[in-house]
Amino acid sequence: MKNNDKKIQAVVDKIISLMETEQDKWFKPFSGYTRLPNNQFISNQPFNLVSMRNYTGFNIFCLFGSAYEYPAYATYNQFKELGGNVNKGETGYSVCYYGTAPTTKTDKDGNAFDSTYSFLKFFTVFNIAQTSLADKAGELIAKKLSKIESQKGDKENLYKKKSIPTVADLENFVKNTGAKIVHREAGRCFYVPSLDYINMSPLDTWKGKNGITGTDFYYSTLFHELIHWTKTEERANRTKNNPFDTTGFGSKGYAFEELVAEIGSAITCSMLGHTKVPMENHAQYLASWVKALKDKPSLLMKASAQANTAFKFLMSTQENKMIVRKVA
């Protein structure tokens, strides 16, 4: 097995283990938000401390379960640039960069032409808690955010929020997408591709339990359906990118799309600082996801990449992006 394949397999094995042991709480590490010393809030989705961009796609899973006070990461050299050092004996986390580079190819007649090739490169990052900067982590993050705010101006501040998200914040995000949301059938939530609308059970029908509010359930489910809504050709264009031939109910392709939607919902909740809770039918998909990932580990990369593309489309619809940090 190639070195990159081993690293991918290690990440997939970790996620499979979480799915098998934590069941519908397997994505919990990136839910909610973190308060900075200056009382600002940031989402719990990991980000690079130098670029201040969130790790996205497969990298979310590379850092999954690494529970630290602040989700700030950087490479060994980046921490040195920040005036710190990685503590002796610390083990880093592998994250990857997928890119393309120019090359020259030859056609069947021997004529050279310009082309590109794809590559996947892994590198190691550490959390700020693993460094000599740990004691002033919150202050350093807040300072970096303030510097970015002064450079961008208030209207372009994509990096922080001054309070936890309100229902009005979440509703504004949904409204800006332009998706048609109806509340015709209580107790049922679904996206109808042929008519291009989402049906949601009314907010007042959602009951809280185990410390999770009905509002948490409602918006987590709505974000799941919004990810389904993005799959059309004019949005995130996922209609032809399903790795399975069949996409009917109960098929492998259907389960894959559900995995994309759940990952996308988790990303959206995380970026908005909202608590992610599972779909009511989440458990029925877990077994099929585990089996699919064991059979083909690369599916997690495909699903996370498509979920990230879907989230970025939702972000592109926003008139006011002040409630989330910039993504790569």
Protein language model features and the residues they cover:
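N-terminal accessory/interface modules of nucleic-acid-binding and processing proteins
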Residues: 1-328
